[in-house]
Amino acid sequence: LVDAITTLNQIAKTIRKKRINNGAIIFDKYEIKFKLDEKNKPNEVVFKTAKSANKLIEEFMLLANKRVAEKMKKGKERFVYRVHDQPDEEKLKNLQTVVKRLGYNLDLNKNRLNDSLNTLLEKTFGKNEQNLIDTLMIRSMSKAEYTTKNIGHYGLAFDKYTHFTSPIRRYPDVLVHR
């Protein structure tokens, strides 16, 4: 079992690296949890980051969603895609202005933008300005949406993508399963 999980983890890391090389944007955010006292008042803040196991599961869920979208594209039926358009240029310029004031660089050239965004995320990880920059970066992105017209998924760097892996909590996944 250990060998199998170790192998799966190596595969997941390879898939993740390939996604990043293809232009995927990786938000490794902290998850914030509050510990409560006996009166349900917060007495401690705990910051959690994704562990290797979380990333392993994430990569295979993304892969499953991608493969289902690729398979269904070959059919003639209408299909629900999860799409994510290019980021808003004006919002990216605003982000560039803010990060420059904080001492960082953001290259808005389309050929280097994704690498530059990921580099910025890496450089600010764990620093005081991380949450601000993460939030501004997310706001500069287009909103992902469900549609029958595929335009790809910018943030994941996928040509075709859908939601398939969580039919218990997302209705679009149920539609895809049908």
Which residue ranges define each predicted feature?
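Electropositive polyanion-binding surfaces
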Residues: 1-178
